[in-house]
Every structure is written in structure tokens, then in C-alpha cells.
């Protein structure tokens, strides 16, 4: 997977400090970075950083992303964490604990195609 543009734009120390500050201020929230997969023809998202309730499911978060990119109901969207499709019923807190980056953010990629083809 290509390196996140968020990671390229912000040095590690700044990302770590921001994630730590967020987690201290909002312990029941998950700091998430959402970016479009390369070569995907799906619309761009208007913002990359989200503060997600820990008890939100992946499926509920996919709904939030769909709304942000104004994707019509008949179009498919896939959300990946480390090139893998997480279970839609999984809690964001569980996905975060298993997959958070060294900087403290959870990185998710979305695409209109199942580009990686891996199910957990």
C-alpha cells in the first residue's frame, strides 16, 4: 500500500502528539484517518480526520463515509485497514486496538472496488 498522504504531510512527532492529545481529551473516541485508495474512481472525501465513537461499528462508519462522499445507494464502497476488509460488525475500538499506527491514528482506505480482495 502506498504511504498515506497524511503521513507525508505531517511528521511522525506531530502526528503522535496530536493523537495523544485527542485520546487524553476524548478517551471514548478513536482518531481515524480516511483516505481514498489510489486509482479508485470513487469521489474524494472532503475531510480525512475523524473522531469516531469507540462503540461505533465498522458498518456504521462506512455509512458515515458514504454520506461524506455523497455516494449513491447502488454504488459499492469498500473500507480497508492494512489492505484487509474488516468485519462490518466489528467495533471501531477493536479495529483500532488491533491496527492502530505507531503514531496513534487508525488509517483506513476506501475504494469503489474490492481492490485487495482479502476478507478477515
UniProtKB/Swiss-Prot annotation:
Residues lipid-modified (Phosphatidylethanolamine amidated glycine): 117
Keyword Lyase: no
GO molecular function: phosphatidylethanolamine binding
Protein name from the UniProt record: Autophagy-related protein 8C
Proregion span(s): 118-120
Region (Disordered), start-end ranges: 1-20
Annotated site location: Cleavage: 117-118
InterPro entries membership: Atg8-like, Ubiquitin-like_domsf
GO cellular component terms, semicolon-separated: autophagosome membrane; cytoplasmic vesicle; microtubule
Assigned protein family: Belongs to the ATG8 family.
Post-translational modification: The C-terminal 3 residues are removed by ATG4 to expose Gly-117 at the C-terminus. The C-terminal Gly is then amidated with phosphatidylethanolamine by an activating system similar to that for ubiquitin.
Gene: ATG8C
GO BP terms, alphabetized: autophagosome assembly; autophagosome maturation; cellular response to nitrogen starvation; mitophagy; protein transport
Swiss-Prot/TrEMBL keywords: Autophagy, Cytoplasm, Cytoplasmic vesicle, Cytoskeleton, Lipoprotein, Membrane, Microtubule, Protein transport, Transport, Ubl conjugation pathway, Vacuole
Amino acid at each position: 500500500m502506498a504511504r498515506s498522504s497524511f503521513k507525508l504531510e505531517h511528521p511522525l512527532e506531530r502526528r503522535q502528539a496530536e493523537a495523544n492529545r485527542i485520546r487524553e481529551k476524548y478517551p471514548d473516541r478513536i482518531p481515524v484517518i480516511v483516505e481514498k485508495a489510489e486509482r479508485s474512481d470513487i469521489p474524494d472525501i472532503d475531510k480525512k480526520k475523524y473522531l469516531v465513537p469507540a462503540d461505533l461499528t465498522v458498518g456504521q462508519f462506512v455509512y458515515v463515509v458514504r454520506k461524506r462522499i455523497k455516494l449513491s445507494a447502488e454504488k459499492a464502497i469498500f473500507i480497508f485497514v492494512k489492505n484487509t476488509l474488516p468485519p462490518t460488525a466489528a467495533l471501531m475500538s477493536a479495529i483500532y486496538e488491533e491496527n492502530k499506527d505507531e503514531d496513534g491514528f487508525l488509517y483506513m482506505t476506501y475504494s469503489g472496488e474490492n481492490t485487495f480482495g482479502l476478507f478477515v
